Amino acid sequence: YAGIFVTNHAWYGNTSVDRSLPWEEWVHGFCAPFYTAKAYGDQIGLSVFFGYESCYQGTEFLIYGVDEEWLLTHPEIKDATITEQLQLVREQGGLVMHAHPLREQAYIPRVRLCPELVDGAEGINATDSSHLSTSHNDPRFDERAIAYAREHDLPMSAGSDVHSTLMLGGGIAFQMPLVSGRDYAERIRGRKEDYVLTNGDQWFDRFGNRIDD
């Protein structure tokens, strides 16, 4: 990897940060792991970018292009509706991607799709489709996500979705290295760059078509 995003589960997701804390303290605690990762990344030459994963009763969204300062000054994001979330994040120049949109698991009461309320969709999720994955492993989730993104003309992303030190190798290969979370948001939303997606096992073009080895 040239770089990674730290996208931990936020306030209504699976987080270890005490939800009873005042907003400012909660944000500092939530962002602390990112700074730890970034400090180590700086030592070894790995770019580390901030993001987070919001949760609406099992429906999850990956948020990019915002930072700790933005969270501190926008406490309304915590209880924002999905519609309000898109507006707030876009005003910052950020990006809202529907995470693993067609995954079916016990923690997801029902699959809810809202193509008009996102900037794109995660078409490739290594936790769903890599042979190394130890959870949620069903490649059909990715196949359906790709079909969904194509149907609604949504740009696609890819990621590992790891919750441990397991190295799945999922992600996106860009022609030029990213310089910030905002840069990532602009490249995905702009759809001008011919990037490729991977789950660590297979490669796909940005439209979700398999690239032969």
Listing of model-derived features with the role each one plays in the protein:
Residues Y1-E91, E116, G123-H152, H163-G169, ...:
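A metal-dependent hydrolase metal-coordination microenvironment
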Residues W26, G65-D67, E76-I82, Y107, ...:
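General structural signal for secondary-structure boundaries
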Residues G51-E53, A99, G159:
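Conserved beta-strand termini and adjacent loop/short-helix elements that scaffold enzyme active sites
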Residues K78-T81, Q92, M97-E116, Y184:
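Active-site-proximal loop/helix segments of hydrolase catalytic cores
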Residues M97-H100, G120-N125, L178:
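Active-site core of metal-dependent hydrolases
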Residues V6, V89, G93, H152-L154, ...:
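C-terminal functional module detector
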